[in-house]
Regions:
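Short, charge-rich amphipathic interface segments used for partner binding and complex assembly
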Residues: 8-55
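Catalytic-loop motifs flanking and including active-site residues across diverse enzymes
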Residues: 5
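Short, charge/polar-rich alpha-helical segments
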Residues: 1-2
Length: 55
C-alpha cells in the first residue's frame, strides 16, 4: 500500500470511528478498525520514511 494512501486511510478511519462512536453496528466497527489496522501496519512497514512534522 502506498504510504500516502495509508496515512489517508488511517486518518479517515480514525475520524469515522470518533464521529460515530456509540452509533455503529458491530460490522461497521470491525470494518473501520480493520482498515485502520492495515493502514497502520503499512505505515510501520515503511518506517524508514520520515513522517512529516505537524505545525
Amino acid at each position: 500500500m502506498n504510504y500516502t494512501i495509508a496515512l489517508s486511510i488511517a486518518a479517515k478511519a480514525t475520524a469515522y470511528l470518533q464521529e460515530n462512536e456509540g452509533s455503529m453496528s458491530e460490522t461497521e466497527v470491525v470494518v473501520h478498525v480493520s482498515a485502520l489496522h492495515l493502514a497502520l501496519k503499512s505505515i510501520a512497514d515503511h518506517n524508514s520514511v520520515e513522517l512529516p512534522h505537524l505545525p
